[in-house]
């Protein structure tokens, strides 16, 4: 089945030529191409068109979960009739195993797995194993981490047909080998139940239950039923049941692995004794022997992934299997924000190796633990068949890979131009900045200010607050969810200014921002490199009045490159707009869209679990509260009284054990206190 792209939009501006050039390159067999797309030019839509034209299974790689989720939703919208999957880390919380020699502290692995993401990961692998060609997997760097091999997974697939003669007990053993668990009481995901001649299987990779009925030794019916009502959804003549876990093995492989582990244990104990360290020898002996007993009795143990090399039958140092091994040979990779994603892929191996070095050196793990790892960059690179690097600021590596050939996408469908860049002396920069902020504030526009240090960000914010400017700051010490909330508050108008150290976040979408001010722009370094300056300047490219001010006493090479490149793009965009009679249009974006749809998710939970609304905590609308004219017009004493009354209501709710209501009062207090600071 081919990809079927569904969209109400048609390619415009630079999109048609970008789609054509990239598609032609893929058809020619070009190994690497670069799409240089400016902020807001519709790179995702271009990527979708290229994927549809290529007609190849595609991996879309993003550098973090949040942007991967955005891409996943967009791709699902573009390809509703095709297999669009999501493959990211399934840990809600993860504390890796570690040993700190300086304090003789051993830290056990601790984790919490997100069942929904686990299901999506299994669905991605199942779609690839099915042989479908119309598969798009949107992934984070999790795709380079170890998992079970494709051959073992393929051998664990259970193929059944209506009318097939198959002993029910033989089938049940196959289910167990595919890591499904029998549970006749609570049919959870990855479990099966047996009642007479009927077997119900809660599929590990979907929301449905598969019901198989026998007549004697013959399969009589294969049906998909609703997991809640058990009502029949559809019937099948044949069906493929995929494993319930990404790590499958056979009894023979397990037996062989135990023998090899015991052999390596003997060698490691001998090594520690030879260097005169009996404590480490005793430690590794006790730990591994305990793990072996657990594997023999239960089939698994804590930290079993550290023995994955033995179960996979790999040699020492051989790379682990990963998601890329499940793609056919002729597949496409699209690396989004490649200037960030490529270095991130390169860094994964080193960090993992450094942590495990102490575990092996001090007798907590066998050396085989080193082989449970992410791919080295060279190994990842070898698995690439064809790749498109996508970035507004491609790095030297990507340009070198594409042999200097770059497909540019500079025209925005909205007609918006790259912002003007103004360089001003750093003397009296704060006073000048304050004047600019007041000008924007009077036009109901927002301002981003970047500093070099956290302390500077905090002090500048304090200065602005003292001058009656509604400001806040974000940096690495501010919690992630708080950062998102602060940015949302900026959009709705609680703040006019947001100060930060590194506001060049790829994907940061704030169309209300008309001014980006860069302090100390001439201080060369990571935060003031050509790419960082270009990314930061791009935050003003979504506003029709977008402008960038660089405060500097000299023009560095990085500044010169950014200014010249922005001017070049701006002239091309101006010319295009004049030739086509386009007037730049301000982007109007739903305020709620910057945040995850917590309220919608909660309402779905209400419907799914049949809870009452009072049982679900819905985040209060920050914008609605901030825009309340009564709150805005309150005097300082009135705000103080309101805070005091709300505190009493919060305490009363807590006494009644109504913690959800108490949390809502708490959030109201926080916002009232912020309003009080502005008085």
Stretches found by the model and what they are:
Residues 1-36:
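Conserved pre-motif I regulatory segment
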Residues 57-69, 86, 280, 440-462:
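Conserved strand-helix element at the start of the C-terminal RecA-like helicase core
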Residues 34, 87-432, 436-442, 461, ...:
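N-terminal cationic and glycine-rich segments that engage phosphates or anionic surfaces
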Residues 80-89, 303, 446-448, 460-482:
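Conserved RecA-like helicase motor-core motifs
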Residues 151, 453-475, 671, 675:
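Conserved helicase motor "Helicase C" RecA-like lobe of SF1/SF2 P-loop NTPases
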Residues 27-34, 56-57, 133-135, 445-446:
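Pre-Walker A (Motif I) flank of P-loop NTPase domains
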Residues 478-500:
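Conserved helicase ATPase core of P-loop NTP-dependent helicases/translocases
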Residues 28-50:
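Walker A/P-loop
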């Amino acid at each position: 089945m081919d990809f079927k792209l569904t969209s109400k939009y048609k390619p415009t501006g630079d999109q048609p030529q970008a789609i054509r050039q990239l598609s032609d390159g893929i058809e020619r067999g070009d190994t690497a191409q670069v799409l240089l797309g400016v902020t807001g030019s519709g790179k995702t839509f271009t990527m979708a068109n290229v994927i549809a034209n290529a007609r190849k299974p595609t991996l879309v790689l993003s550098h973090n979960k949040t942007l991967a989720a955005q891409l996943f939703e967009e791709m699902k919208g573009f390809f509703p009739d095709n297999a669009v999957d999501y493959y990211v880390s399934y840990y809600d919380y993860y504390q890796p195993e570690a040993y700190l020699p300086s304090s003789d502290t051993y830290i056990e692995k601790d984790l919490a797995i997100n069942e929904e993401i686990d299901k999506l990961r299994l669905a991605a692998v199942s779609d690839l194993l099915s042989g479908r060609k119309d598969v798009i997997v949107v992934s984070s760097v999790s795709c380079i981490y170890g998992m079970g091999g494709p051959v073992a997974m393929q051998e664990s697939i259970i193929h059944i047909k209506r009318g097939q003669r198959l002993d029910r007990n033989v089938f049940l053993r196959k289910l167990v080998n595919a890591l499904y668990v029998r549970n006749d009481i609570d049919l959870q995901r990855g479990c099966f139940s047996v009642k007479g001649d009927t077997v119900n299987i809660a599929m590990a990779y979907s929301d449905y239950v598969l019901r198989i009925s026998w007549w004697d030794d013959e399969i009589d019916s294969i049906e998909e039923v609703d997991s809640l009502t058990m009502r029949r959804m559809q019937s099948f003549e044949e069906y493929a049941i995929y494993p319930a876990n990404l790590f499958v093995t056979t009894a023979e492989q397990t037996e062989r692995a135990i023998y090899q582990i015991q052999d390596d244990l003997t060698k490691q104990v001998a090594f520690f004794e030879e260097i005169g360290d009996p404590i480490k020898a005793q430690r590794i002996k006790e730990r591994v022997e305990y793990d072996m007993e657990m594997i023999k009795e239960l089939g698994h143990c804590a930290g079993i992934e550290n023995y994955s090399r033995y179960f996979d039958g790999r040699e020492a140092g051989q790379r682990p299997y990963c998601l890329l091994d499940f793609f056919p040979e002729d597949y496409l990779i699209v690396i989004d924000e490649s200037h960030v994603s490529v270095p991130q892929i390169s860094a994964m191996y080193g960090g993992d190796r450094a942590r495990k070095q102490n575990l092996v050196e001090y007798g907590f793990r066998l050396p085989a633990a080193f082989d449970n790892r992410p791919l080295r960059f060279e190994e990842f690179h070898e698995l690439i068949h064809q790749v498109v690097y996508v970035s507004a600021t491609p790095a030297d590596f990507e340009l070198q890979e594409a042999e200097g050939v770059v497909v540019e996408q500079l025209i925005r469908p909205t007609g918006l131009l790259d912002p003007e860049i103004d360089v001003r002396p750093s003397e009296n920069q704060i006073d000048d900045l304050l004047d600019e902020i007041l000008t924007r504030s009077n036009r109901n526009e927002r301002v981003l200010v970047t500093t070099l240090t956290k302390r500077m960000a905090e002090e500048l914010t304090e200065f602005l607050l003292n001058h009656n400017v509604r400001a806040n700051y974000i940096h690495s010490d501010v919690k992630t969810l708080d950062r998102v909330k602060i940015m949302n508050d900026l959009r709705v108008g609680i703040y006019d200014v947001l100060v930060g150290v590194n506001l060049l976040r790829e994907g940061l979408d704030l169309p209300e921002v008309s001014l980006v001010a860069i302090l100390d722009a001439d201080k060369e370094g990571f935060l003031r490199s050509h790419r960082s300056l270009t990314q930061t300047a791009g935050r003003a490219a979504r506003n029709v009045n977008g402008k960038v001010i660089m405060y500097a006493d000299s023009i560095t090479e990085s500044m010169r490159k950014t200014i010249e490149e922005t001017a070049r793009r701006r002239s091309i965009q101006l010319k295009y707009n004049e030739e086509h009679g386009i007037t730049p249009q301000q982007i109007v974006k739903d305020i709620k869209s910057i945040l995850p749809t917590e309220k919608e998710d909660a309402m779905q939970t209400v419907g799914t679990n049949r809870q009452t609304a009072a049982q679900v905590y819905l985040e209060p609308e920050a914008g609605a509260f901030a825009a309340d004219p009564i709150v805005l017009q309150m005097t300082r004493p009135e705000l103080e009284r309101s805070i005091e009354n709300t505190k009493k209501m919060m305490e009363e709710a807590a006494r009644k054990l109504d913690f959800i209501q108490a949390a809502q009062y708490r959030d109201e207090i926080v916002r009232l206190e912020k309003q009080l600071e502005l008085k």
